Amino acid sequence: MTPDLLEAGAVKRQQYQAKVEASNSSGGRAAAFGRVLTPGLPDFAHGVALYLDEVTVSFDGFKALNSLSLTINLGELRCIIGPNGAGKTTMMDVITGKTRPDKGSVTYGQNIDLLRLRENEIAGIGIGRKFQKPTVFEQLTVFENLELAQQADRSPRASLWSRLSGAQLDQIAEILTLIHLLGAAQIQAGLLSHGQKQWLEIGMLLMQSPTLLLLDEPVAGMTDEETERTAELFLSLEGKHSLVVVEHDMAFVDQLTQGCKQVTVLHEGSVLAEGLLSEVQANERVVEVYLGR
Ligand SMILES: Nc1ncnc2c1ncn2[C@@H]1O[C@H](COP(=O)(O)OP(=O)(O)OP(=O)(O)O)[C@@H](O)[C@H]1O
Ligand SMILES: [Mg+2]
């Protein structure tokens, strides 16, 4: 732990609590990182992190998801591809409680019915979500963003009186290293590049040690180098977390799957194909609806 990290850890919470409130990020953001009491602990004994069974979502009669079934195993890195409008983001909306399906079930582990939980409860039992646009607190430093994401209790009282423990500082340092921002810990998040902001947001999600991470087009707008580093980051997370990565960038998907992982192709709200990237790329129906556009 470097001295300036320690110093940053001692920053009075009330100083940046005010900044958080003035920050340009959405009000629900801090809440989404918050831990909440939940009805029970997820049971992962069977190695399944998430199970969607025949999930249907209709918008004015249009089926954005059409009897979608999908299983994500514990520690698995699963790439999901599909043309615009295939239902990829809607699927994440359903898993995180933002959208309620008309039909079907969504089970976390083998026992938690996610359809019965609210968005903040779902975030609190280990499901983190990264939206396409980075949503970090621009006026806070990188360190402060991670510190805030780490706090279980964000009430003003807790913010005023709590001090970071050695273990908490170690966790922040570990995540800073992982997301390539150790040297930028004291920089205001608003000054980071687009790619660095994306990494910071991923780091903020990791502070909560999520079991399942949902990442919607995480490398959109990144440089080639940033994209490659992001793939390395995700590969290093594989096994420790389940990752569901929605992406259009096939070179990135190729790097993530390393020629040996299953890719899921969504089309019109259902699974069109599943297999190695090379297999789905050679699948005529996939070529027709997606790759051949
Ligand atoms: N709130 C909504 N109201 C009405 N229609 C919606 C709503 N959300 C999504 N849709 C429609 O549902 C379909 C699936 O959208 P979704 O955003 O899930 O697709 P996607 O696979 O994420 O596409 P993209 O690759 O462009 O991000 C689209 O036709 C979209 O217009
Ligand atoms: Mg989308």
Model-derived regions, located:
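The feature captures the beta-strand-to-loop junction immediately N-terminal to the Walker
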Residues: 81-83
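ABC ATPase NBD Q-loop/coupling interface
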Residues: 105-125, 162
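Helix-to-loop junction immediately C-terminal to a conserved catalytic motif
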Residues: 96
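ABC-family P-loop ATPase nucleotide-binding domain
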Residues: 1-56, 293
